[in-house]
Amino acid sequence: MTQTKLFSTGLLLLVAILAGFTASSANAQDASAPLKTPTAADYERQAAQFRGVWVSTVSNIDFPSKRGLTADELKAEADAQLDRAVEMKFTAVFLQVRPMGDAFYPSKLYPWSGFISGKQGQAPDQNLDVLQYWVEGAHKRGLQIHAWINPYRVTIGGKLEDLAENNPARLHPDWIFKHGERYFLNPGIPEAREHVVKGLVEIVTNYDVDGVHIDDYFYPERNITEDLETYEKYGKADFDNIEDWRRDNVNKFVADVNREVHKVRPNVVWSVSPAGIWANKGSHPDGSETRGNQCYFNLYADVRKWIKEETIDAVIPQIYWHIGLEIANFSILTDWWSDVCEGTDVKFYVGVAAYRLDPNSKTEAWRDLQEVNRQLVYMAASPRVDGQVFFTAKNFKEGQPARNTMLEYAKEHNWKGVNDGNPNSVK
């Protein structure tokens, strides 16, 4: 995800941009930030809600712990992750199965991920079908499992020659562009978009996943120039400016996925996790009272349109800021997304920054290890919030601040997990 899915230097910089932080504003508090007091009924409703956790595989953030593990070691780590999800009273795991133009399962369209074996294109030990093992393990425990892909990212550095020969970027070099040190599939090329859609159809055809999911990487940023020729070829005749054309490319992709995956599996959940700010009020009349990086303008993702037109089943905005932050207030953004989802059938799950709880954080609000619990209280009193998804799985290991504080909250408010009659369980 733009703020957090990679902890590389470049993406940490993007975190700062996305949050819109400056040294002076990072701790700025909005004294007028609206607060809510949940009722007993609110807490009871929250106790039985959908709760998910992202399991990041890019750069081995969460799984596997390192490359080159044996099949038995991969299974043991998967079991530990799934057992922990049950313990935390989660109801779903979002497993990243395509971090970079690759796959955590045998695919006809993408090579095996190098984050498993150490070399892209090389199968895991004993040809273990990693996704299938996770699907079976999740369902055995009553957990939903959602297959999470990054649709367009090809590399985070390195050379194309280092990729497997059957990587789409190697097979179709005309489908890609390089921005900085990273390569991306070009969303403006219809065949490239179609290939990504086919990849998701392959997953729902071959695996009993409960959902398919993408995060917030669409176009890499606003000030790119690498697709000007693509615009001349595919967009200029119909669009007066490249910005609207880019948004249309992303809109088409989202609608195509919605149509094609539901042809195969009508009940599968198609979800998107965008950056937490759609647009600022100062830039768009329908935007939020914020001053941060905007997915509508910077990533060309018109998520509000997808919600209103119901071309997605669930939205999980990454509201990765604290309550009271002047430029991007958690409470203001939660209310904004609630209002957008009101009157639609789109589920609204809040993406919560569990990873930011840190007694040594440079931001005062996140040094207070109760910040996520305060956000949970606010969400309990927000009737249009349907649940949460937490980033990221490693933050719920033994001794981690998010684990300890959330277990306390879950116990206090009698959270129902997959073994306690939560309606989101697959049991």
Model regions and ranges:
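Polysaccharide-binding and catalytic clefts of secreted carbohydrate-active enzymes
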Residues: F90, A169-T311, Y320-W321
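Glycine-rich, aromatic-flanked loop segments that form ligand/cofactor-binding clefts
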Residues: T39, A47-G52, F90-G101, V130-F177, ...
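Active-site clefts of carbohydrate-active enzymes
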Residues: S56-T57, S271-R291, I319, L333, ...
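Active-site-adjacent "subsite" loops/lids of carbohydrate-active enzymes
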Residues: A48, S56, N60-A76, A147, ...
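Substrate-binding cleft of secreted/luminal carbohydrate-active enzymes
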Residues: Y300-R304, K308-E326, G343-V426
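The substrate-binding groove and active-site-proximal loops of carbohydrate-active enzymes
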Residues: I61-D72, W112-L128, G180-E194, F239-V250, ...
